[in-house]
Amino acid sequence: MLELITDFSKKSFKNYSMKEELKFNAINIIYGVNGRGKTSLARGIKEIIEENNPDSLRYFYTDYIHELLLLEDSNKFKGVKATFGTKNVEIENKIIKLKNEVVDMTDTKKLLVEKRRKLRELINEIHKSRKGNLKIPLKSSNKSIEEVIAIYEKNLKDAKKIEHNIESIRNFVANDETLYNKYNSIYEVMIPSLKIETYDVDRLTKILQNNYTDIKIPSFEVIDWLRNGLELHNVEESICKFCGNNLNYNLIKEKIEIYLLNEKKKDFDYLKDVEKSIEQLSDNYEQYLSNIDIFVNELGVQKSVEESLGDSIDEIKRILKQKLGNMENDNLKFPSDDYITLISRLSEIEEECKEKKKIKLKELNKKTENINVIVTGSISLEILENQSIREELSSIQYEENECKKQEQLNEEINAKISKLHENQSDYNDFKIYLNGVFESINLHIRLKSDETTQNYYLYHDLENISLNIKDISEGEKNLIAFLFFYFELFEDEKQETIKSNIKTLIIDDPINSFDEANRFYVLELIKKVLKSKFNQIFIFTHSWNDFCDITYRLKGEDHNFYEVYKDHQGTSFLEKFKKVKTPYKKLFQEIYELSRKSQKDIVEEDCYYYHSINSIRRVFEEFLSFKLKNSDLAQKSNQPEIEEVYRKMTGNEMSNNKKIKLGSFLTIINVLSHKPYRAIDVIGSAKFLMRYIEDVDKAHYDAMKD
């Protein structure tokens, strides 16, 4: 049994040696606020014990589930050996008997696959031999024979709609590629786009005849904005309604008129767009002319004087190019009538080509479809009337049905074998027992054995789905981890017999992120641990409530209670409790001691201050509960009620300076409880709280601090 630690150094413990009067007992309950070195002490004790007999120690800590339970790169848990019942040799005999009942269907399935392949080949050969030179594709290879037969039955029905004589369908011979070649050649004819945007002829005429002068002007959007804004004013007004500055109505009006008169840039861009469209139209028209014989001879497009349209296009291109080259040239005339006629006629040509192509394809398609349908019907008839195909398919279907029945039976037998293997496994009893515990505490998580029967994975018993460790809450993770830790300690399901090799327990923060029901459940397990016959137990906790619950009614001379402290230099040490205080008084005295500190007492690496803000808020809430029915008033939004408590208890109004400090205090204890902050602000909050309580209730203050 470990009694004293000497020359111990780990993090905030600096060459620490315990005094003789502090030496450890059989049961040791150690309290420490987060940041004081509690976990460092737990790990240090673990390392000391492991030096002599590592197998005798069980150590529970924050990362127990990740470091000791989870398998690497997996969401599986390591199995726990436990034999809570006798293993019957009859299980093995049952397994052997069941294995003999399993029929291997591998060869049968391969044979059936081969039979289907050969039958499909026969169907395809009939199809190929009857289709002649027509492009009638084979049925999709990914369809079953049954699906293919159904398609052929439909094909025959379609053929009968065209050719009612069944003998004509049976004797129909396919031998015509001409229709297909014709269809493909027409289908591949590309009709160029001869439609363009119809531009404003009047504007084009105006631009071509306009003589522009070069004046720097704002953007047309700005000009438009100025013009609209000016309409909201009148000539007598001298102040702008928008900005409030001086307004010269006539000067602004004159400038707008100048800007509006010069639209050279805008018109230039417009002409460029027109030129680009005409260029594209010219290219497309040339493409049309190069294929004119196809359009006329193959599609039946009427040929008239369309070739002369190219001259009109070239003339428009020439005029646009001249104007764009010299915007001051006002001697150009836009051929409006020719342009309108050109655009209209080209659009008609494109529509005529499209319509003629559509009609031609429809005509050819109808002819080819009739041939295809009848030929396909002829193919279908031969396949459907083939006696060998019908008999072979019927035989295959019967054998497959028998094979499926045997496979289902094999699955049932293998499920029974797996269940027997689980029952035979040394890891199964622990799983069954722990699942019973999960059910008893209304936790809808269960363990299932993996294929090795030596590991477990999680699943949800209601939704019946597998769970990853990330799918469950922190509280559930911690609960599962502690249950694994606890039940692994015992040989029997009643937790009466400890495994013989286990002598020492170290449990660091066993209660973390639990709801109240699970917290009390784990507390009861800890109390059972304390009553069990271990050589030595160390339990560490950062929660004073948990410390009080664990130590409650713990009697006898075999236990000690400790607290981890830090001195002003940030060095950790142990003190023994003489008397356990109530949780509120303990927190009060911690905050009281904190309020007596100053800037010089702060050690930079000491995170104790950052954890203390929660304790400050809890003490304040508890104190307010003595004064008000609503104990949730420790919020910035409830500052008036807190000020009223001060007024009623002291008989004085709170000064403005104190009100400001109260507001700052309420903000800090609510905001900083969720994130770290400066230690000096935490100390300042502790000082404010103690002053407030002392002012409001001096008797309470004196009773709690001593």
Curated annotation (Swiss-Prot):
Pfam family, one: AAA_13
Coiled coil regions, renumbered to chain: 86-162, 269-299, 337-427
Paired cysteines (S-S): none
UniProt keyword Coiled coil, yes or no: yes
InterPro entries (UniProt xref): CR006_AAA, P-loop_NTPase
Keywords: Coiled coil
The keyword Coiled coil belongs to this UniProt entry's keyword annotation: yes
Protein name as it appears in the record: Uncharacterized chromosomal cassette SCCmec type IVc protein CR006
Organism: Staphylococcus aureus (strain MRSA252)
